[in-house]
Amino acid sequence: MLAIGVVIFFGFLDNFTGNIVFLGGTIYGVIFALTVRFYAIPYGGVISGYSRIPSNLFDASKSLGYSTISTSYKITLPLIRTSIIAAAILTFVDIVKELPMTLILRPFNFETLATYTYQFAHDELMIEASFPAFFIVIIGLIPILLLQNQLNSFFHSKN
């Protein structure tokens, strides 16, 4: 449904600009749609990490003369680094599996593992479909295992 909305938006944009900017069937259209679709995952993860930072750290930083940008780089970023990494991993795994928007919005001759799997399965070539499907599983599994390892080491270090 979101892919259809993106197609309509880009069609309106193309008509409004007199077809100067054609984004509907380009990689930019796919990137825009994936950004809109998966924005909630990293946003929620980063906000969750940011909300755990006590506000008195920012007050102490200002009283010590640090600017807002300096505080962001020296205090905020190191404290929410794990939240950013976890959000990036979860977003990456979801993007690798995404088929509907990629199938609708992709440019001609632009294939992903999900579109290869879909095409082979649609043609009932299950053996050929198993290879890209297996890679989707492996590509999705490795970051999740790394994230699980990080979480286990984090929770065991607290005990």
State where each predicted segment sits.
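C-terminal transmembrane helix and the adjacent membrane-cytosol boundary/short C-terminal tail
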Residues: 47-77, 89-90, 130-159
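Residues that define the loop-to-transmembrane-helix transition and helix capping
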Residues: 27-28, 58, 69, 81, ...
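Membrane-embedded alpha-helices of multi-pass transport/permease systems
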Residues: 29, 36-58, 96, 100
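Interhelical loop and adjacent transmembrane-helix boundary motif
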Residues: 96, 102-145, 152
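Membrane-interfacial helix termini and adjacent extracytoplasmic/periplasmic loops
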Residues: 1-35, 69, 105-109
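Hydrophobic transmembrane alpha-helices of multi-pass small-molecule transporters
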Residues: 41, 82, 140-144
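Hydrophobic transmembrane alpha-helices
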Residues: 28-40, 89-96, 106-108, 135-140
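Hydrophobic/aromatic residues in alpha-helical transmembrane segments
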Residues: 2-6, 42, 46, 88, ...
